Amino acid sequence: DGEEGELVFTSLTKEALPIIRYRTRDLTRLLPPTSRSMRRMGRITGRSDDMLIIRGVNVFPSQIEELVLKMPALAPQYQLVVARDGHLDTLEVFGELRENTHTQDSIAALAGELQHCIKTYVGVTTKVTLTPPMGIERTLTGKARRVVDKRPKNT
C-alpha cells in the first residue's frame, strides 16, 4: 500500500480458464482501504516504459515535468537529452522561459534552482539549459519531443 508500481489487472471471474495478468505499464499507487469493497488507486503518474536509467537512477520524464510545472517562470515545455560520456550516461534538461525579459543572471539562477530541485527530488545530477520562448523545437502538432536519446545504439 502506498508504494508506486506498475498497475496489473488479473481477471478472477473466468471459470475453467488460466489466470492471466494484464500489464498496463501505467505507474500508480494503491490508496489506503476505505469502507468500499473495491480498492482505489491514485492518479497515473507515468508509464514504466518511459523510464530512463541515468547512472543507476530510475528517472521518469513525469518527475522532471512536475518540477518544471512548479516554476512559474518556466513554460510547460521541456526536453530531456540523454547522451553517453565515456561509460556513463548523462542527462541534460532543456527548459523554456515563459517570457523573454530575464537577465543572464536571473536565467542562471533559475537554471541552478531547477538543477538543485532535480538533484534533490530525482537523485541525479543534470545540466540545465533554459531557452527563450519557443526555443525548444516542436513537432507538427505543436508538442515538444520530450526525450531525445543520443546514446549509441550498439552498446
Where is each model-derived feature located?
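Active-site glycine/GP-rich loop and adjacent strand/helix microenvironment
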Residues: D1-T155
